[in-house]
Amino acid sequence: MATESSPLTTHVLDTASGLPAQGLCLRLSRLEAPCQQWMELRTSYTNLDGRCPGLLTPSQIKPGTYKLFFDTERYWKERGQESFYPYVEVVFTITKETQKFHVPLLLSPWSYTTYRGS
């Protein structure tokens, strides 16, 4: 049975170790009108490769403002590491639901980088 590929993906790399960030908890939310409140769509964890497949199905995606919340404090504490950022929030806008969106996160205890990937 074929599975639908998610139009939204993320990949988290632990740049301190040079390895994928396995087991990092993340939450996906969408900003809902008219109250402008975040509605949580999914909570998940990165897999062995630092990826989180199936964040959204093609039927779930719609134009709007989305947020990926990464629980970096818990991730680093589980590794016995102090960190500066307790969490990372990446807020982005989807204008065309027919496109694919990839949100990589490069993570260390003292910094992070994100960008729109392909």
UniProtKB/Swiss-Prot annotation:
Role description: Catalyzes the hydrolysis of 5-hydroxyisourate (HIU) to 2-oxo-4-hydroxy-4-carboxy-5-ureidoimidazoline (OHCU).
Recorded consequence of changing residue 51 to E: Strongly reduced enzyme activity
InterPro entries per UniProt: Hydroxyisourate_hydrolase, Transthyretin/HIU_hydrolase, Transthyretin/HIU_hydrolase_d, Transthyretin/HIU_hydrolase_sf, Transthyretin_CS
Entries under SMART domains matching the protein: TR_THY
Keywords of the record: Hydrolase, Peroxisome, Purine metabolism
Annotated compartments: Peroxisome
Enzyme class: hydrolase
GO biological process: adenosine catabolic process; allantoin metabolic process; amide catabolic process; AMP catabolic process; dAMP catabolic process; deoxyadenosine catabolic process; deoxyguanosine catabolic process; deoxyinosine catabolic process
Subunit structure: Homotetramer.
Pfam entry (one): Transthyretin
Name used for this protein in its record: 5-hydroxyisourate hydrolase
Matches recorded under PANTHER family: 5-HYDROXYISOURATE HYDROLASE, URICASE AND TRANSTHYRETIN-RELATED
Protein species of origin: Mus musculus (Mouse)
Gene3D superfamilies membership: Transthyretin/hydroxyisourate hydrolase domain
GO terms under cellular component: mitochondrion; peroxisome
Gene behind this protein: Urah
Miscellaneous comment in the UniProt entry for this protein: HIU hydrolysis also occurs spontaneously, but more slowly.
Biological pathway: Purine metabolism; urate degradation; (S)-allantoin from urate: step 2/3
Statement: the UniProt record of this protein carries the keyword S-adenosyl-L-methionine: no
A molecular function (GO) term: hydroxyisourate hydrolase activity
Phenotype upon changing residue 102 to N: Reduced enzyme activity
